[in-house]
């Protein structure tokens, strides 16, 4: 059965001390609650080893925002999936639009990253989505289907371990949001191509998150769609009251 998930993506924010404080604050905010969704925080690498033991693992999962496409070796500045896993982190965001746009991550590179993450026991949160020009040209389905090739090389067993996140790139950090109807339409399309590849059962069990200016004021409406299983949250994840407001959308 697929899960409802609210995952925070801190991006390149928070010093070590600030990150520890934010994680502690979130942990305290959820201390006496039982959220109706899985809660995940994905942090910069420097926070992982400190934050993971601080939070209640029964309520908050911890993940990285990226990992290398190589297992180990002379790759200065890179952090491997094995290293991420050694901190106790359980998740890793892969294929975020910022990584694709600014760091040239391709279908082939992401295919390697996904395989290494899975081999080291990490759950990939695999991101897909179109830019404004592609949306205006009505090419969003074509773009998303091409991006999914990075994970469609996986066995059915491995694919069933990943989480998908649809992010309309034109809505990230812009204040624009896909309408609930737009979100449902493309989430349903994504689920349909998963079903075509792996069958209806795996498709029905795959969590597909929405990532694009999701906030407490619109989360409930977005999450009420049958194919929207939660959110990948950027800016709102840096403020506990906002992040908890989104988590609470599943309690309303």
UniProtKB/Swiss-Prot annotation:
Keywords: Cytoplasm, Gluconeogenesis, Glycolysis, Isomerase. It comes from Bacteroides thetaiotaomicron (strain ATCC 29148 / DSM 2079 / JCM 5827 / CCUG 10774 / NCTC 10582 / VPI-5482 / E50). It is an enzyme of class 5 (isomerase). One of its GO terms (biological process) is glycolytic process. SUPFAM superfamilies: Triosephosphate isomerase (TIM). Homodimer. InterPro entries: Aldolase_TIM (IPR013785), TIM_sf (IPR035990), TrioseP_Isoase_bac/euk (IPR022896), Triosephosphate_isomerase (IPR000652), Triosephosphate_isomerase_AS (IPR020861). Substrate binds at residues 9-11, 173, 213, 234-235. It comes from the Bacteria. Belongs to the triosephosphate isomerase family. GO terms for cellular component: cytosol. Gene3D superfamilies: Aldolase class I (3.20.20.70). Involved in the gluconeogenesis. Catalyzes stereospecifically the conversion of dihydroxyacetone phosphate (DHAP) to D-glyceraldehyde-3-phosphate (G3P). This is Triosephosphate isomerase. One of its GO terms (molecular function) is triose-phosphate isomerase activity. The keyword Cytoplasm applies. It catalyses: D-glyceraldehyde 3-phosphate = dihydroxyacetone phosphate.
